[in-house]
Amino acid sequence: MGKSNIIGRFLKEYPSELLKTDIEGITKIGNQLDTNSSYQRIFTGKNVLPSYDRINKSISDSSHYHDLFEMPIKHHSSLHLVGTLSADNFYGSQKHLEEILKQAKGRGIFNLNIHLLIDNSFKTKEELLSKLQELENFTTKIKLGRVVTIAGRDNLHQDINLKYFKALLACFVGGKTNKSLSPEQIINLSDKKDGFSKLAPTSIVEDGYQKGRISGYDTVLFFDYNNDDYDYLINKLVFGSGLFGLKIPKSLNIFTLSTSKVDKIKSIFPAENKKDIFDQISRDNKIALISEISRYAYLKPFTENNKIDPTFIDYENNENNFYLKLLSDLKSKSEKYELTILVIPTLDNAVISDSMEKTIKSLNLYYQFLEDVEKYILEKDLLFILTSSYGRINNLNNKRDNLILPNFDPVPFIVLSKYKSESANLQTEPENSIASNYLNLKHDILDVAPTLLQMFGLDIPDSLTGTSLLN
């Protein structure tokens, strides 16, 4: 990275918020964009961000798979794969699971357990049974792997789903252990009043049933990339306390296919909490934000009369030269205007491909792009706000499920600049600043980070239940 390393650090540390954007001019992506709504249906979430030293591998590390498969062989222990089973396989997680299974078979793994979280994309029990049968057929074919945990998932912040995760966590740490149920049993536990995704949790966990328990020197791989569920789950496993008061054996080896570069966050930021971290970075005049948007880049520079001159780049159709084109547009536009906001494509969407090789290649391109952006902005002394795909989907109008997901967390942002904040007009005369005018545009950014609002001296709407990092 460049001298400040600020982008990479914040990408590893912070969650973020989705920016709701005006539908006009946005590239339609499959059936994700509801043309009757100003909101987008985006299937993404916070990446896995473990910060224990022993969880120190990412898919960009060439030794990742060597260590992953060597551990269970060395200790004559089990390999456990944890991830989501989805009807539409939107992120290709099942393809990755199958590839991991084949690699494990080739490396001589003899005991492999699969722990599945079933998302709410399945609308009928036949659809779920078919997907489970497809996976079972594959494991039978290669003669490796068994599904030992099935749990439902929906919105993590609902109590019913916390019980699902307690069921899955119990499989890791002992106490009440997880009973493996057949697909038919899982489906029969469904709460018919609330729909198929509301699986009754209490019958999933029973005392004395040891099948599939994770313990000792076992190795765990989280093969899912994109759900804030997994950040929540791994943090509960890693820190071994909090909601469930559970602890994991120190000998347990945990790996993740996170698209973030796993690092020693505490050594980078010795501050005790996020506010201290924020203040620490602020003193260096490099403050804040990361937000998210789907598979296109959204380059938003300001014109002199505060009208937006957007540049849309369709990621799907520009995969080969996407980052070069984006960087070129950034350079050509950023020097013309006082303030530039760049929303790069979601990290999950931008890098995840149907093979590990392509995914690693895309990940490397992505981080090279971040390095180039950082270097350019700091060299040119530009005032620049970078938003990226890192975080929970908050305040998103989910048309399919008619559900509003509330914002629970503070949302940071990144301002890259060598300017002093007062000279950049971020805190003086906010009512006349370009930022104030921009943020008040109708049908543009409908939901912005509380921290960003406070930084610009603007009121935080009651609709944002998250809090500013400056508080």
Positions of predicted regions on the chain:
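Feature captures the catalytic ectodomains and active-site-proximal regions of enzymes
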Residues: M1-N471
